[in-house]
Amino acid sequence: MAKSKFERTKPHVNVGTIGHVDHGKTTLTAAITTILSSKFGGEAKAYDQIDAAPEEKARGITINTAHVEYETANRHYAHVDCPGHADYVKNMITGAAQMDGAILVCSAADGPMPQTREHILLARQVGVPYIIVFLNKCDMVDDAELLELVEMEVRELLDKYEFPGDATPIVHGSAKLALEGDKGELGEQAIMKLAEALDSYIPTPERAVDGAFLMPVEDVFSISGRGTVVTGRVERGIIKVGEEIEIVGISATQKTTCTGVEMFRKLLDQGQAGDNVGILLRGTKREDVQRGQVLCKPGSVKPHTHFTAEIYVLSKEEGGRHTPFFNNYRPQFYFRTTDVTGAVELPKDKEMVMPGDNVSITVKLINPIAMEEGLRFAIREGGRTVGAGVVAKIIE
């Protein structure tokens, strides 16, 4: 069976379901694909197809994730759903499935539970920009006042983690009824309402090519008579011949000019997001550039050494550490293409971190790295991955 061609006619957005175990994330995912596929085409996925999520590896960490896709009137969505709580933690921290927005599923019968809170906090820490709420199992609650109370609790929880509680769309429904073909307002109509909320509340994300130019340095060569060539994959934006660029990270920031872009040994006028290119730099010496730095549009990214991060520490079974670590732990932090040693400061209430935990930490690197909030990294000891993390807030 040949794979059908991906038609890029509608803008593409990445979303996912989050929320407490057994509140109905997977049932909702099945209901969305079932109802939207009948309206806009696409493939319906049954509950057990989604629940049997295949294993994937991201940054050396095994994660179970189910990927489905569906269309609404205006957009094409890629949607991730994870079977277990640990999979969510790993997924959100490694950025294996980058989300432009999340659908928080909360059971109206139970109200917000510990993982509801934890997933909202994670979404805030890893930079998921928008949350829409699906209040599920509303068919099990007869009391309208109780529904109102649960909705209020959810809005307060969103506010607490700096999401706009009052402005957040909350859709009341029952994923189970919808999946069973119920056409009522808690069934199919609720799914259609959710689709409208996705379309209107989550803005179309900026495409990588529209961002400010950035390319991590992978290798540096000296070509006699021509100068220094830096190779790598353009992460975002466009670089044109003749443009000024900065070299950021490790040492003091330097300014230079791009005098040539080549790809597969051919000269180009420009390189753009996704391209593997060699960039020729004017007047830059071979020893001025090294792996771990980035080339970027001047002023767009700054080098930093001190930041807070949300991290996941691999369990022993995943090939991680066998023992806990303590305050002032000094592993290597692998950003983009290189390792930098840093010291870890634990939160006041944490004496140690066990393999398999996720925790907020503060890090001080020995060398500056070009970074922005939301940048992902791996934590390594002697080349072996022992954790994954994401920059939450830059301190300096």
UniProtKB/Swiss-Prot annotation:
Enzyme Commission no: 3.6.5.3
**Family matches, as PROSITE patterns:** G_TR_1, G_TR_2
Assign the protein's first listed, main location to one coarse class. Answer: cytoplasm
Task: Specify which residues bind Mg(2+) according to the UniProt entry for this protein.
Answer: 26
Describe the task this protein carries out: GTP hydrolase that promotes the GTP-dependent binding of aminoacyl-tRNA to the A-site of ribosomes during protein biosynthesis.
User: What family is this protein classified in?
Assistant: Belongs to the TRAFAC class translation factor GTPase superfamily. Classic translation factor GTPase family. EF-Tu/EF-1A subfamily.
Name used for this protein in its record: Elongation factor Tu
Natural source organism: Methylibium petroleiphilum (strain ATCC BAA-1232 / LMG 22953 / PM1)
